[in-house]
Every structure is written in C-alpha cells, then in structure tokens.
Design a protein with these regions (language model features):
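Secondary-structure boundary elements
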Residues: 28-183, 215-216, 390-555, 602
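Short, ordered, surface-exposed loop/turn motifs in non-cytosolic proteins
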Residues: 276-277, 284-302, 319-321, 522, ...
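Structured interaction patches on ligand/partner-binding surfaces of diverse proteins
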Residues: 330-354, 685-713
Length: 871
C-alpha cells in the first residue's frame, strides 16, 4: 500500500538528493541555452517580491543551475510562488538519478528529456512528491525491461493503483489519485505521465478538446520509445502499445493537442506559443488529415489561432466538418469548413452583436479509420490475468476504507450524527483518517454542527484530499454580520477550482487588525487595495493550477483568476461574504439584498450593480428527449465586445470533463442574465456520429424578459435497416438470469425488437454506456422489449455487479457470449474492430438490424430511445 506522504514529508529523501551531483551541462545547445537565460532573466525581473528565487543563492553545479533556470523560466507562476526552490531542485536530482540508473537513460535525446521527463507538472494538478515516491516503487519492476515493455509495465502498476470514475474538473495530484484509488481520465493520465517520468521515460498527456462524433472529450498518454511516440490508455493496460478503447473514436477526431513545457522546437504543428508552454497538434498520429487556411473558434472551441498580416492561418485537422468562427474589433463571421474537401475558406466578417438571427447546418465527423495492432490470444489471456490480479491488489487497499458499518461505529463512539458521518467518511475513501481525526475533535454540540456544515460545503473531491490543518483553519472563521451568509460565503474554504489551503490563519497573521476591521466595515476598500497592489499578468500562470491566496500575497502578481480567488479568500478571512459566481465567473460581494459585482478596473460601488434581464426558452419535446441537458444538448454563450463567444458554465455534480443542468432547471421558468448579446447552440446527435446544430442569436434587455425557442432538430428518415443478425443465435444466461442452459435470443426475447449488448468489465466505454442506459430506465421499461447484455466470458460475467449501476432497466437479462454473437455482429455489420467493446444493436426476430454502436459513445440511452421511438 502506498505510504501516506503529505506535501513536504519528503525531507529525508530531499536531504539525500540535495547531496552534490557533479556536473555536465543540462543544455548543450548554446543558442537554446542563451534563449532560456534570457527568458529566465525576464521572469526574475517580473517577480521582484517574495524572495521567490532564493534557491539560486545556493552553490549549484552547472547542470542543476541550468535545469532550475529552465524550469523557472517557463513554469506557471503557481509553481514558483507555492513551492520552495528546494522542491524543484529535489525533482531535478530525482530525474537525473533515474536517467543514470535506468538502462534507457543515456538513449533519451536531450531535448526529449528536457521537455518530457524533467517537468513535474503534467496539467493543472497540485504538485507533490510523486516523482520520488513512484521511483522507489517502480525502479525494480522496470530496470530489466526494454523501454517499450517498461511503458507497458508502468501502466500495469497504475492499474493497481487507480481505475476510472467520473469526478469534477479540479485535477487531483498523482498521490491523491493513488490514495483515492480512482480518478477521471484527466487524473488517470496525469498519474501515468507522472509515473513514466519518474523512471525517466518521456511522456505527455494528449487530449481531444471535443470528440467529433460524440458529446464528450478525453485525455490519454503518449510515451516515447526508441525514436517514436506511442499512445496508451492510462490505467487501462493492454498487451501492446498503440491500443486502447479509444482507437476508433480517436480515428474520428478533428484535433489532438498536447501542451509541451517551455519553448519546444519539435517537428509537430504548433498551435500556439505562450510564456509557459508550446501547444502542439498531434492529430496526424491518429487520423488521415487535411490542411486548410482558417481562423478557428467554435462553440466548444477546439482550436484558436491568430492570423498573419494577410489575414490567413492554417490548421491541420481530421477529415470532417468544423465550424469556423472569425472575429476582429467586435465584428465576427462564421462558416462550415469540410476538411479534406476544401483547402481554403473565406469567411466574411459582417456580423455585429445585437443582430437576432437563427442558422441551421449539419456537421459530419471524420469516418472511422483506426488501425489496430495485432494481439494474439496468448497475449490477451496474459493481460487479462494480470489485470485481474491488479484488481485484487487495488481492491485489497480499498477494503481498508471506512464502510457504512465502521463509519457508524465511529460515529456512535464520538456521539455524532450516524447518517451524516457515515456518508462523509465513506465518501472520503483513502482520506478517511483525516476526516475521522477532524470529526473526533468536534466535542461540543456547536462545534459538531459547525464541523459537519463545513464538511458539507466542500466538494466530494475535497473530502478525498483535504488536509486536516485546512479544516481546522476554516473552523476558526470569523463570524459575519449576517448569519445567513456565514456558512456558504465566509466559513466555506472552497472558492473555485483551487487546492484548499489554511488561508484564514495566514491572513489573520499578515493583515493588521485595524486594516481587517476597516475592510469589513467598507468592503470596497479591500477591492481598491487588491486592484492597487496585485499586478495582473495575463500569461504568467498558463497551464498551471490557480495560485494559492498565500502565493498571490507573496508574489503580488497573479493571473486574473488567481487574483479573484485571492480576493474572495481574503474577504472571507475578514468576515466579508464573497464568492465567484459559478455561471459567469464574476467576483461578487454577498449581501442580504443579493450579489454585488466587483470590478477591479473601476472601483465604484454604484458601478457594480449591472442591469439584468431574463431569458425564458420554450421547448417542444421530441422523441426520447423530454428535458435537454446542458453541454450535451445545448449551451449558452455571451457574445463579447471582441466578437468572441464566452461559454456560460452551468455545472452540476461529478461528471467527467463537465456535467450540466437541464432545460427545465435553467430555462423553462427563466434565468437572470446580464444585459447583452448571447448565443444559444443546440445539437442533435445522430446514431452515425453526425450532428444537427442550430445557432440562435438573441439579446437580453435590462428589466425585460426575452423569450426564445430551444429546438432540437430531427431527421425523421434516420432509422433504416442497416444489416442482418441471426436471432436464433445462442447465449448462456448468467446464473440467476434464466438458468444456465443455452438459449436463443428468439427464445429469450420473443417476437419483435430487442437490444443486444456485448460488454467489457470495468472499462470506461462500458461504464458510460450502462450509466446512459440507466438514465432512460423508465422509457426503456415502458417500451417493454428485452435487453440482453452479454460478457465475453464467464469470469467477467461473475465479477460484474449490477448494483454499481443503480437504475438499470428491469428488462435486462445478463449472460455470456459462448457462441460468438460478438463476432457475428462484427462480421455482419462490417465493424472494423472485433475487440472494441461495448457493442450494441437493435434488431428484430426477422433478423433485421436497425441500430449499431461500437466502442465509446456518449448518450447511448438517448440514441437507443430515438431509434425505438422511430420504429
């Protein structure tokens, strides 16, 4: 089991690693080194306060000084302000140690090592000592392997530690993911990249901003071996590289991005260069591509590029349709570009905000073109055996978490609310020792009420990685004048997507009592102080986590988002109720009369009350969709004065890469919006992956209600016979689902239509499919036709727990595909990948197939019902 390691519990390791290391140069390219030195000097001059560069006062060998300068020149400001220089020096020495001790260390080119091994940061996670911890766990497992096989082995190790589960958008640190034993795809891929880099293997996180064929996105990993990049699904080990459940969806992708630390001079197409990273497009590793000369920005912006002086820019993308959005000086224009069919597109900038109009168009994604590497049966069997053992290792660790029974026993012992304590302790998973220790300190009835209120204010993910000193700090929050605002807007430590810190004690120590009292009496004085003393550098923290409030205070420099978190944190520390609005991102002071917007550029109280109007949208229900979902079916964006779309966020609950509210919850009865111009985008996803979008431009007028229609476009002729399937095919019912003797689908289902699904076990695509089906439980039960869900073998069927997917229709029966139903579907429907699961069909007992889906598909339940209701 992973040892518990707090943020700086690596002091002993640090002392060892800080021993002098001899020193060749870290950067041997003289021209590149000069560029780094220039960028480092600029960065140092930009940050004169806070003694942030004290580590350079040490007597360091050339290699370490150059490596530190490289990191400090380009790392996000959060990594400079929130972590001591010794932390970064420790990781430099750990990286060098891995390069010296691993057999492939000397084969890694200098530039590949510099950009894809040395940096600790992968995305926007909190940094921790994972590099040191993981190396000690992994070194003996991989040191005798080839680089190719070591990549596979590290992924098996990651599977021992974590599996996929959706969660909110804040990215857990690698050690927190291990402690929790699960994570969303962005956290799994962060874990794998961190683990690979810990043993000196170059790795990078790759993501598609938006799948072209389905309403979701994904992140995975590329690792470098022997001169080329391979891809793999994080914590989802396969027998070979370049194989994952997402092969097929990736082959339909439009763009694949990765952010490379620092100034990168590789061969890939550069999307953008920032002071912190170089964003590159690696789509050519996955799909046939085409180039076009465009400026691109869409409703889920997949790319943003700047034109040259002639108004032109090129982009490489998969061969599908993309909406091109061009803006300049407040005007904008847009058009559809079919990549591969047209190489140039001229977009006329002839529209301005405030013009009401509606436009419909069709989007077709790239065709599937995945090239799967061969896997022989022996390889698959061995991989399955290993995965089963890894599941048992991880489950043994998970068994140490508090259960409902043990949590209730704990609650009884300390005279706590059993129901509430159990829910919170079980949700905290591997962090239960922190939450239970905090609860045990709650002795009086008042402290129990306050402590449990605090634990309910923070997010589910916070429960899994919050530190005890943070909870204690915020329990000591000062009372505000209005008790109704205290719990949510003063004591609550969570402001936005930052890592929680004990900032209230910090501000109590650094802000004088007189100043604190003055700010509480007149909060606009605090607004003025922040506006005057915190300098905004828009690009200082790109690619990083938000700077902590303590880090902003120390540096007196921040990006706007970190400044906003800083202000709200400082306000709450002085009993001033404040928040960042989750929808608009605005900073607001909270009063008994409502929210007052904060404008750091114009600090006048009367200017803060922006006029609002109201938006109401009617909706005429279409088949299978009573209540459209935000993000999946529609979005709202504000049209800015620059002619760009600013997406409004309406997030709800834990959902990978964002899950939102619905039409009924948001627009049926209306919602308040600032006055201005807006865009409503709706999109109907077709079974084949295409989209039927509609864009509605409208305005919100102060004090008035704007009424529009939310229309989900339909295509009545979509359902047709697309293949054949033998309804006499046999399967073996799972014990308890109709006996264990083989039955035909006709026997099991009777005459008429039925659904057949071939499932994998504990894989993200299957889990998504089952959750999507559960969401349509009532409609599928009302339809009344059987759904036969089969597993490839008895072992997987035995391990499947339907209780893990509450709400599945009662019309489901489970079984084992003992007679090759999956193979028949693949062959008859001419599917390209015999092993890609899940597979779903709707067929009838006349052997006609009217629907097929393979692999990763968001909204499967909806697609099934759309087909059913059009039969």
């Amino acid at each position: 089991m992973m040892k518990r390691i707090t943020r700086f519990s690596f002091l002993l390791v640090l002392m060892c690693l800080l021993a002098a290391c001899g020193g060749r140069s870290f950067i041997t390219d003289a021209a590149y080194r000069r560029r780094v030195e220039q960028d480092f000097s600029r960065r140092k001059a930009m940050l004169p306060q806070g003694d942030l560069f004290a580590v350079f006062d040490m007597d360091l060998p050339a290699y370490e000084r150059e490596a530190l300068e490289f990191l400090y020149a380009y790392m996000p400001l959060a990594d400079i302000a929130d972590y001591p220089g010794e932390f970064h020096l420790m990781n430099i020495r750990a990286s060098r140690k891995a390069a010296e001790e691993m057999p492939w260390g000397k084969t890694i080119p200098e530039d590949i090592f510099r950009h894809f091994v040395l940096p600790v940061r992968v995305n926007n996670e909190q940094l921790d000592s994972a590099r040191v911890v993981f190396y000690e766990e992994l070194k003996n497992r991989v040191k005798s392997l080839s680089l190719y096989d070591a990549i596979l082995e590290v992924n098996h190790w990651c599977h021992e530690k974590a599996v996929y589960t959706p969660s909110d958008s804040r990215t857990s640190s690698p050690l927190a993911t291990v402690r929790t034993a699960y994570g969303r795809c962005g956290e799994e891929s962060t874990l794998l990249v961190a683990a690979l880099r810990s043993v000196g293997i170059p790795a990078r996180q790759v993501y598609t901003p938006r799948w072209a064929h389905t309403d979701d996105n994904h992140a995975w990993v590329e690792a470098w071996a022997d001169g080329r990049w391979y891809f793999l699904g994080a914590c989802e080990p396969e027998p070979v590289l370049n194989l994952g459940w997402f092969n097929a969806p990736a082959s339909r992708g439009m763009l694949m991005h990765t952010k490379v630390f620092g100034r990168y001079e590789g061969a890939e197409e550069v999307m953008s260069v920032t002071p912190n990273y170089t964003e590159i497009n690696v789509v050519e590793n996955y799909v046939p591509t085409a180039k076009a000369t465009v400026t691109v920005e869409d409703e889920h912006t997949v790319a943003r590029k700047q034109t040259d002086e002639k108004g032109k820019v090129f982009l490489t993308a998969g061969k599908g349709d993309m909406l091109v959005w061009v803006s300049k000086d407040g005007k904008f224009g847009y058009a559809k570009l079919p990549f591969g069919k047209e190489s140039e597109l001229t977009v006329k900038i002839d529209k301005v905000a405030g013009e009401a109009h509606t436009v419909d168009f069709d989007i077709v994604p790239p065709p599937e073109s995945a090239d799967l590497p061969e896997v022989i049966s022996e390889q698959r069997a061995e991989n399955d055996r290993r995965m089963a053992r890894e599941d048992s290792i991880r489950n043994a660790y998970v068994s140490t978490f508090m259960t409902d029974e043990t949590a209730r026993e704990f609650a009884k012992r300390y005279k706590l609310d059993e129901e509430l304590a159990s829910r919170l302790l079980v949700a905290s998973r591997g962090n239960h020792w922190v939450i239970s220790d905090f609860m045990a300190r709650l002795r009086s009835e008042k402290s129990k009420r306050g402590g449990f209120d605090l634990l309910q204010q923070i997010s589910a993910k916070d429960l899994r990685d919050v530190r005890k000193e943070v909870l204690i700090d915020h329990m000591l929050s000062p009372m505000c004048k209005d008790n109704s605002l205290f719990s949510k807007y003063v004591r609550n430590p969570r402001v936005s997507n930052e890592m929680l810190t004990p900032y209230k004690t910090f501000f109590k120590d650094v802000v004088s009592k007189a100043d604190a009292e003055a700010y509480e009496a007149e909060p606009m004085k605090l607004v003025a102080w922040v506006a005057e003393h915190i300098r905004i550098e828009k690009e200082c923290n790109l690619g990083g986590a938000p700077i902590t409030p303590e880090g902003v205070w120390k540096a007196r420099v921040a990006d706007a988002h970190s400044r906003d978190i800083f202000f709200v944190s400082m306000a709450r520390s002085m009993a001033i109720p404040a928040r960042i609005d989750e929808v608009t991102g605005k900073v607001q002071l909270m009063t008994a009369n409502g929210a007052v917007d904060v404008n750091f550029d114009q600090v006048q109280p009367e200017s803060q009350m922006l006029q609002k109007g109201r938006l109401v949208a009617g909706y005429r229900s279409v088949a299978s969709l009573d209540d459209p979902k935000y993000y999946s079916h529609f979005t709202l964006s504000k049209l800015t004065s620059q002619g760009r779309l600013q997406l409004l966020s309406y997030d709800e609950g834990d959902a990978d890469m964002g899950g939102g509210t619905t039409w009924a919850g948001l627009l049926k009865n209306g919602t308040a919006l600032d006055a201005g111009s807006y865009v409503l985008v709706t999109g109907t996803r077709l079974a084949g992956g295409g989209v039927l979008p509609r864009i509605v431009f409208f305005s919100i007028v102060p004090g008035q209600t704007t009424e529009i229609e939310l229309v989900m476009r339909e295509r009545k002729d979509e359902v047709q016979v697309i293949g054949s399937f033998n309804s006499e095919s046999l399967f073996t019912p799972r014990s308890g689902d109709g006996g264990t003797d083989k039955r035909s689908l006709l026997q099991a289902c009777g005459r008429g239509y039925f659904v057949v699904g071939i499932l994998d076990l504990n894989q993200e695509p299957t889990n998504h499919a089952l959750c999507d089906i559960a969401a349509f439980k009532d409609k599928l039960e009302k339809w009344g036709r059987p759904m036969v869900l089969l597993f490839p073998d008895e072992a997987k069927a035995a391990k499947f727990a339907p209780a893990s997917f509450p709400g599945l229709p009662s019309t489901i029966c489970y079984g084992i595909d003992t007679d090759g139903i999956a193979e028949q579907i693949v062959n008859n429907m001419k599917l390209k990948h015999k092993e890609a699961l899940p597979i779903f069909i709707i067929a009838d007992t006349f052997n006609r197939v009217v629907f097929v889906s393979q692999g990763y598909t968001i909204g499967l339940g909806e697609q099934l019902m759309k087909t059913v209701e059009n039969l």
